[in-house]
Amino acid sequence: MVTNSNITKIFLVLNSGSSSEKFSLYEGEDEVCSLYFEGIEEAGKKKFICTITRADGSEELVNKKWDSLDVAFKEAKAIFEKEGFINDAHPLDGILVRVVAAGKYFSANHIVDEQTFKELEKVRVTNPLHVPGTERGIKNATETFAGVPVIVMSDSEALTNESRRDTAYALPKEIVSEFDLGRWGAHGASYGYMMGRIPELGLLEKKMIVCHLGSGCSITALVDGKPAYTSMGETPLEGLMSSTRTGSIDPTIGALLGEKLGAAEAIKLMNKQSGLLAMAGSNDMREIIAGAEEDNEDAAAAFDLFIDGVVGKIGEFAAKMGGVDAIVFTATIGERSIPVRSAIISKLEFMGFKLKNDIKLDKSAGYANVAEDDSKPVYVIPTNEAAYMIKKAGELLDNK
């Protein structure tokens, strides 16, 4: 296979859901085209459609419907070739599959081989929601794009660092070893990007806290630009509540639910049917804020618990670091929600943080400091997880 060793590499980034497939094609860090296959109901039957999104933001619905999602990879390859994005002169250099899975193996990035599938089988029990889709995506990619390296991108790699001070659980060593347990963390691609972007923007401080607030939510504390503490653990369920996750709860509740519902259903309940959705009936923070403003008690309770969770974790990490010099907000809620940022920072004035009349981020600047002049900085910095994964995949291929 021809490779782009000395020119911009071309990568296909996969996002395999339980009933959807997204294919994002990148030339270097620039997304040139994406395809999104999703299911719809039509005359009582499930059909699958595909939307093409081009670099200029224009969208086109493919004039075709399919009976199964299994055709997505074959159809995606045909569409990319027809559009001229992939051909003999512009071959794919690699296919990237993000893996949200625990264990030492998945704390690093790997070119897929037989060992990868063995390791996926090991973590299926602790991650029944993500692993099946990931496994399906990898198998379809290797079959459809024969000869192209498929790379599993760890969602904890950037957090796997000797600077971490919170990787252990207080469990018997033999149990930890047998089940390969640890506080691996998640959202690593976002934090990895931030660890490069913050100093690049000249914003690095001694003690910083980065709040990744999106559909999933986590917080990581950085000391000298390296991870010291992170809120997620063996799985993304530990830590903050989020759109559909409980966040940390009494483990006995998890055990009880597992006994009553079965382990897989209990894990699904705590990951997909809890959090903001369970409390407020919506997993959309905008709807929850609107509901709280209209005196909807459930929405107000959900919003308050969410804010208290973030503030509490910031306080915990600040205490562990002996202070905090700057706070960063990123991901969808962190970047876009002025009410969320305001509610959080209003509780942190005792730490030296105050917001001015918060402004929406001017993306042309690359970041915004939304703090008062006499406050420690509060930055809003857009994340770019794909850019980080592409960088790390390129390094892996160059060094193989």
Each language-model region and where it sits:
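Glycine-rich phosphate-binding loop of actin/hexokinase-like ATP-binding domains
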Residues: A158-E259
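A mobile "lid/hinge" subdomain adjacent to the ATP/sugar-phosphate binding pocket shared
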Residues: K260-D304
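Glycine-rich phosphate-binding/hydrolytic loop that grips phosphoryl groups
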Residues: P339, K356, K360-K400
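Phosphate/ATP-binding catalytic cores across multiple sugar-kinase/actin-like superfamilies
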Residues: M194-R197, L201, A302-G322
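Glycine-rich phosphate-binding loops at beta-strand->alpha-helix junctions
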Residues: D325-L348
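Conserved phosphate-binding catalytic cores of ATP/NTP-utilizing and phosphoryl-transfer enzymes
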Residues: V2-I7, H130-A146, H187-M208
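Short glycine-rich, Thr/Ser-proximal phosphate-binding strand/loop in the N-terminal lobe
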Residues: S19-D67
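Short beta-strand-loop/turn "lid" adjacent to the catalytic site in phosphate-handling enzymes
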Residues: F80-H130, P149-I151, E157-A168
